[in-house]
Amino acid sequence: MIYQLLTKNKGLISVLAKGIKSKKDYTSLKPFRELKISYIAKDKLSLLTYYEILDDYKNITNTFYLAGIYFNELIYKFVPQQEPSQNIFSLYKDHIIYMSKTSDSIDMVFFKFEILFLKEIGYEITLNNLNKNSIDLNKKYYYDYEVGFKEVQNKIDLKNSINGDDLVFYLNNKLFLIKNIKTFRVIIKNIFQRLSGGTKIKSYDLF
C-alpha cells in the first residue's frame, strides 16, 4: 500500500507500507492522523518501517472529514513532493485541531484554510492599487485575476463582486463579520483552477 504523508521536515513524501494487511493497520493509517514514523529514504518511493499514532483527532465530524479530503487534494496538487515547508505542515495540523473542536460553519472552515494556503504557496489574494482607507464601504469590487481587486465600473464586473464593507472585514481579518463568504470562495476556487491549468478541484464539489 502506498501512502502520501505530509511531514514537518521533508514536506510531502510517498511511502510504501509493506505488510499492511490487518484491519487494525488500515484503520491506523486513515487520513487526518498525526503519526510518528520511521522510513528508509528512496529517490521516489520510501519504505515505511514504523509508525505510531500520536493523535487521531477522533472528534472530527463527518462533514469536516470531507473538508479534510479537500485540503488533502489542494496539498497534493500544489505542494511539490519532498519540498520542506514547516508552514504548510503547521497550517494543516492547526486546521485539523481546529476542525476537531469548532462549531463554525463549513464555509468558514474552508475559507480560513484557503486564504492561508494561498498565502503559503505565493498566491495570496491581492488588492491591486487599493488600500483599506480608499475602499468605499458602499461600493462593489471585483477580482481581476492578473492584478487583484478593482472597483466595479460596469455590469459585467458585478458577477462575483464583493461589497466594500466585506472587503474591509477581510483585510482586517474579521472573517466572522463577512456576509458573503461564498463569493470570496468562488474567487478562490477560480484561482486554484487557474493555477492547475483549468483542471477541476474534484473534492470542491463535495459541498
Walk through the language-model features, giving the residues of each.
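Non-catalytic alpha-helical scaffolds and adjoining flexible linkers that form interface surfaces
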Residues: 1, 6-207
